[in-house]
């Protein structure tokens, strides 16, 4: 039985972010729809050919998405929210963009669909909306068209579909409450139709993704898999595909299904290959996810070979990435600035395809010399001075319980802060960043390329900070920010100023829609060689009598939004970052900055997928935040910001952070998230986001007032702040001014109404 290679998916955006540029040009009205579609076709063709040349036997088709693959599935099923529907019921690419970005077919504003994290990754999906009695039909044939494209190019392919049970699990009920699982019988005919169309095209295998099978699902949801797959059986071979965790706890459910193969993530799960082999039906194919699709590290192929070799020849076997390579940068070969030693430790998506080919060849032949050669740099890394810092390890070992305790409880601190800042009721602020204009980006780029000297760069940044302060004072905001003109990305900026990180030139990965991020890579112990944010915060504060917030990205978020080391625990990395940023808090305070925001938007998304593993993670995650913040004096107000969050199941931990003020993203969920804070009787101050910064829509004064009144029904008004959902980096100045002016006006109206 010859072993084959395949990937579960490939990055969509292009090596030079071609998809992002084409999307944004189309949205701005600068290019035609046909030009956008052409870019998509070219990217797909290139990526299929690149994977094939790298040694992939079965190419994924259907992993490409114009915005998000869950949203693509919604369109496939005809699941379009009423507010985004065309009058004639037709569906096109503009429908898809309206759902993701927030527009009605008329061009009028309409709330975008909710967006949240894809399991525990840094990718976001558009949450499907379900209503009672909803109808489904095949309305969007993108998958079939792309299958035809790939077949016309002569490729051997494996279409990819998001499975029906996971699709329902990922969605939310809108309107009258009901059990969304009851819709399963209604969506299955569409899946049957799609599989029939694939069978007509001669497709042998379909990858059907059911990552919900790695979760601790309610029994009713586990029970739903059997009837669902009974309905889908018989037209093509189905590779039931799971990832991000192991499947052993749900294996009894899985082995009862009428599928022909199972993909398991052997990186992030604890599944034992021998046990899987023993328990799976003898005629099933096992797809072994041996190469990590979520990181940038070169794999120890000798270890992978040993992990799987015992079952070679005993059952049909494929080797694969653990999950889609969507979460990895595309190509290491274009990284020209990484030094040779560090570069030898990495593998990006194309190199991971090459790793799979090496592994396949060794497993098929029994010859392992190439694996040993490939894995040699990994042995060298274990002893590199770039990795270990004795001073950091010593400081980490010396942490005590006192290091994570503020001097006094919140009630005492709040009195000191009220006396210091004398803020009005409904105080207004923003989350941190202001629009990153072409001028700002050009300034940073010129400095980075050496076309601008340090003095001129600093003069330019200072001018943008000054303008941000002037704008905020003109708008009448109460607590100001410096606008972060000097920062490219909230994690990358800190990583650049901390020892232990390295950066890539083209290591882009998709975050959502057209947004891409270039995560730093943690290669060693982390420390702060010098202050990072103090100079610009101090300068901004010198321009105004109003308080200016110091802005830090928190330790758990820096960890979660970086590619972490694999040789130490995530807890170790988080606490090393916390100690480095603790020194930054002390320096900001000494420089006269009275309000310091420590953003932790990633705290919840870092949760393990299984609830039984949550407590240990939350314990060290909260401790890391507190180590970071606890050096602050009582009169220094510590803020934190979180977004894309569901809080009700971690409220104890949110409260345990002991931040004086928490700002959260709530507008897309119509203040639903505040239910958690009300039920918990959250004791500190809260800023519920009053408008969605991911949408270009400008909220009206009335809209914001209505949201704030709704918030005040749940949280005492004296503890409420007024702010947008998130930073304003991706917006333009005209819409930012208009939205903030309406926000400030709404706050003033509520003060007068008291």
UniProtKB/Swiss-Prot annotation:
Cofactor: Zn(2+)
Catalytic site: 694
Cofactor notes: Binds 1 zinc ion per subunit.
Binding sites annotated in the UniProt record for L-homocysteine: 431-433, 484, 599
Residues annotated to bind 5-methyltetrahydropteroyltri-L-glutamate: 17-20, 117, 515-516, 561, 605
CDD domains per record: CIMS_C_terminal_like, CIMS_N_terminal_like
Keywords annotated in UniProt: Amino-acid biosynthesis, Metal-binding, Methionine biosynthesis, Methyltransferase, Repeat, Transferase, Zinc
GO molecular function, one term: 5-methyltetrahydropteroyltriglutamate-homocysteine S-methyltransferase activity
EC number: 2.1.1.14
InterPro entries hit by this protein: Cbl-indep_Met_Synth_N, Cobalamin-indep_Met_synthase, Met_Synth_C/arc, UROD/MetE-like_sf
Protein residues bound to L-methionine: 431-433, 484, 599
Gene3D superfamilies: 3.20.20.210
Catalytic activity: 5-methyltetrahydropteroyltri-L-glutamate + L-homocysteine = tetrahydropteroyltri-L-glutamate + L-methionine
Pathway stated in the Swiss-Prot or TrEMBL entry: Amino-acid biosynthesis; L-methionine biosynthesis via de novo pathway; L-methionine from L-homocysteine (MetE route): step 1/1
NCBIfam families named in the record: met_syn_B12ind (TIGR01371), PRK05222.1 (NF003556)
HAMAP family in the cross-refs: Meth_synth
PANTHER family the UniProt entry points to: 5-METHYLTETRAHYDROPTEROYLTRIGLUTAMATE--HOMOCYSTEINE METHYLTRANSFERASE
Annotated protein name in UniProt: 5-methyltetrahydropteroyltriglutamate--homocysteine methyltransferase
Organism: Salmonella dublin (strain CT_02021853)
């Amino acid at each position: 039985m010859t072993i084959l290679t395949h990937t579960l998916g490939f990055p969509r955006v292009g090596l030079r972010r071609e998809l992002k540029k084409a999307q944004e040009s189309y949205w701005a009205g600068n290019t035609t729809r046909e030009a956008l579609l052409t870019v998509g076709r070219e990217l797909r063709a290139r990526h299929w050919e690149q994977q094939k040349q790298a040694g992939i036997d079965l190419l994924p088709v259907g992993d490409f998405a114009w915005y998000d693959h869950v949203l693509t599935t919604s369109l496939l099923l005809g699941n379009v929210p009423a507010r985004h529907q065309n009058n004639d019921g037709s569906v096109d690419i503009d429908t898809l963009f309206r759902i993701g970005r927030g527009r009605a077919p008329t061009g009028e504003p309409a709330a975008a669909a909710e967006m949240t994290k894809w399991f525990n990754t840094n990718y976001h999906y558009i949450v499907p909306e379900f209503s009672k009695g909803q109808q489904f039909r095949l309305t969007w044939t993108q998958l079939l068209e792309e299958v035809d494209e790939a077949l016309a190019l002569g490729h051997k392919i494996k279409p990819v579909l998001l499975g029906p049970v996971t699709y329902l699990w990922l969605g939310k009920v809108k309107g009258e409450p009901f059990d969304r699982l009851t819709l399963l019988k209604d969506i299955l005919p569409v899946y049957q139709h799609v599989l029939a169309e694939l069978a007509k095209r001669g497709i042998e295998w379909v990858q059907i993704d059911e990552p919900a099978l790695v979760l601790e699902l309610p029994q009713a949801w586990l029970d739903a898999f059997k009837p669902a797959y009974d309905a889908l059986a018989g037209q093509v071979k189905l590779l039931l595909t799971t990832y991000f965790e192991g499947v052993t706890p749900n294996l009894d459910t899985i082995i009862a299904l009428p599928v022909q193969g199972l993909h398991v993530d052997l990186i992030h799960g604890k599944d034992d290959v021998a046990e899987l082999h023993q328990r799976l039906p003898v005629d099933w194919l096992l797809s072994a996810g041996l190469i990590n699709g979520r990181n940038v590290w070169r794999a120890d192929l000798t270890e992978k070979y040993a992990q799987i070799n015992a079952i070679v020849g005993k059952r049909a076997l494929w080797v694969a990435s653990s999950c889609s390579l969507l979460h990895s940068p595309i190509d290491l070969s274009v990284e020209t600035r990484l030094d040779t030693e560090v570069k030898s430790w990495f593998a990006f998506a194309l190199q991971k395809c090459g790793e799979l080919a090496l592994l396949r060849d060794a497993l098929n032949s029994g010859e392992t010399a190439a694996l040993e050669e490939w894995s040699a740099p990994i042995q060298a890394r274990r002893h590199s001075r770039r990795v270990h810092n004795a001073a950091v390890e010593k400081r980490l070992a010396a942490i005590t319980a006192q290091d994570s305790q503020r001097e006094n409880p919140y009630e005492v601190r709040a009195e000191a802060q009220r006396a210091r800042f004398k803020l009005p009721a409904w105080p207004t602020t923003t989350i941190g960043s202001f629009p990153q204009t072409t001028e700002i980006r050009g300034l940073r780029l010129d400095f980075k390329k050496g076309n601008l000297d340090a003095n001129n760069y600093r003069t330019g940044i200072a001018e943008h900070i000054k303008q941000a302060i002037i704008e905020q004072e003109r708008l009448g905001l109460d607590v100001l920010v410096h606008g972060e003109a000097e920062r490219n990305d909230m994690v990358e900026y800190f990583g650049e100023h901390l020892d232990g990180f390295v950066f890539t030139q083209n290591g882009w990965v998709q975050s959502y829609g057209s947004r891409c991020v270039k995560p730093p890579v943690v290669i060693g112990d982390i420390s702060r060689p010098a202050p990072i944010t103090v100079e610009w915060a101090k300068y901004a504060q010198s321009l105004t009598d109003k308080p200016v917030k110091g802005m830090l990205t928190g330790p758990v978020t820096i960890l979660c939004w970086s590619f972490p080391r694999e040789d130490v625990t995530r807890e170790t990395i988080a606490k090393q970052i916390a100690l480095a940023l603790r020194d930054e808090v002390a320096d900001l305070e000494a420089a006269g900055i009275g309000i310091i925001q420590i953003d932790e938007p990633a705290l919840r998304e870092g949760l393990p997928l299984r609830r039984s593993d949550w407590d240990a993670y939350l314990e060290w995650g909260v401790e890391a935040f507190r180590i970071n913040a606890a050096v602050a004096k009582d009169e220094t107000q510590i803020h934190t910001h979180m977004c894309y969050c569901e809080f009700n199941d971690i409220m104890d931990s949110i409260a345990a952070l002991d931040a004086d003020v928490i700002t959260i993203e709530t507008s897309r969920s119509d203040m639903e998230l505040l239910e958690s804070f009300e039920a918990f009787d959250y004791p500190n101050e809260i800023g519920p986001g009053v408008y969605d910064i991911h949408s270009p829509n400008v909220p009206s004064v009335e809209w914001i007032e209505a949201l704030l009144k709704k918030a005040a029904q749940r949280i005492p008004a004296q503890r409420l702040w007024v702010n947008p959902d998130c930073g304003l980096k991706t917006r333009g100045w005209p819409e930012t001014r208009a939205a903030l002016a309406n926000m400030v006006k709404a706050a003033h109206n509520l003060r007068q109404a008291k």
